[in-house]
Swiss-Prot record:
The gene is ecfA2. This is Energy-coupling factor transporter ATP-binding protein EcfA2. Keywords: ATP-binding, Cell membrane, Membrane, Nucleotide-binding, Translocase, Transport. ATP-binding (A) component of a common energy-coupling factor (ECF) ABC-transporter complex. Unlike classic ABC transporters this ECF transporter provides the energy necessary to transport a number of different substrates. Belongs to the ABC transporter superfamily. Energy-coupling factor EcfA family. GO terms for molecular function: ATP binding; ATP hydrolysis activity; ATPase-coupled transmembrane transporter activity.
Length: 318
């Protein structure tokens, strides 16, 4: 069973400055402590997140990804380490520490950080779609009239027209339910959004729409944290990748810093993105294609374009 007893802090959390929005310092999480089943899900996490960036957290199953992000919005608290969350509106940091017996301003924390779970459609429970989308904003203090406007706006943004507002969510298809559930999260208008396996169970069209949604969130100056096992999507969207292994951050960096490091890739069982694998294969066949690494193509379309460019440049020189 998870324990969250209070202990005195051994050090003060470092204040967040500039574009910093979230910091974990010495964060640990242990289940069944001091029993034969003791398991350290997190074992000393130190990392700072900044606004207007997309972070992808990757790692083998059981590496601590979901446990980490569920600390960020207060679903789990730990007796080891601290979390600092930037509250720009009130010009201070919300600090969750071993001394935190009860999180103050919990609604404010929910307003700052929201989370789209792996299958968000199972969160629907109201008798109309409008009420489902309004639930989060109203619970966090938004007036019902404003919440109704938000419901309409974000439902439309997710590709469903306003005629769905009075429909029961239980009359929708699985894909439509997911759109409604995500609209409800977006309507909270959080500064930090966490997506847990956002493309799981989606068809190619749905995956593309989800990627576009994540990229749009970044354009709105939000911090986006994505947990995924799909390395193709990591390469496509991530500004920074955090690789977890056995509850620790093994390394972090840009997608190409991670995926082109053979030592890192050999340490884990993570599959290379197809684009990187193709570059590796081409480089072995002909050294001129090593230049492709410099371009850092994100998608197959990008790769095709830079391959043509590398070939043209080679032909010009020869």
């Amino acid at each position: 069973m998870f324990k969250s007893w209070s202990k005195r802090l051994k050090y003060a959390p470092t204040p967040l400055v500039g574009d910093e929005v979230l910091r974990a310092q010495g964060l640990k999480c242990v289940f069944d402590e001091k029993t034969p089943e003791e398991f350290w899900a997190l074992n000393g996490i130190d990392f700072t997140f900044e606004k207007n960036k997309i972070y992808c957290i990757i790692g083998n199953s059981g590496s601590g990804k979901s446990t980490l992000v569920t600390h960020f919005n207060g679903l789990l608290t730990s007796k080891y380490g601290t979390l600092s969350i930037r509250d720009f509106k009130n010009n201070h940091d919300i600090v969750i520490s071993p001394n935190t017996k009860k999180i103050k301003n919990f609604k404010r924390l929910r307003k700052i950080i929201s989370m789209v779970f792996q299958f968000p459609e199972y969160q629907l429970f109201k008798d109309t779609i409008q009420k489902d989308i309004m639930f989060g904003p109203v619970a966090l203090g938004v007036h019902k009239e404003e919440a109704a406007k938000l419901a309409k706006f974000y439902l439309n943004r997710m590709g469903l027209d306003s005629s769905y507002l009075d429909v029961s969510p239980f009359e929708l298809s699985g894909g439509q339910k997911r759109r409604v559930a995500i609209a409800g999260i977006l309507a909270i208008q959080s500064e930090i959004i966490i997506f847990d396996e956002p493309t799981a169970g989606l068809d190619p069209k749905g995956e593309s729409e989800m990627v576009e949604l994540i990229l749009e969130s970044k354009k709105e100056n939000k911090t986006v944290i994505v947990i995924t096992h799909q390395m193709e999507k990591v390469l496509e969207i991530a500004d920074e990748v955090i690789l977890l292994d056995k509850g620790k951050i093994l390394t972090s960096g840009t997608p190409y810093q991670i995926f082109t490091n053979p030592e890192i890739m050999q340490t884990t069982s993570i599959a290379l993105p197809h684009v990187v694998q193709v570059i590796n294969d081409l480089s072995l066949r002909n050294p001129i294609f090593k230049k492709l690494y410099d371009y850092e193509p994100r998608t197959v379309k990008d790769l095709a374009k830079v391959i043509n460019e590398v070939i043209k440049n080679y032909e010009k020189r020869n």
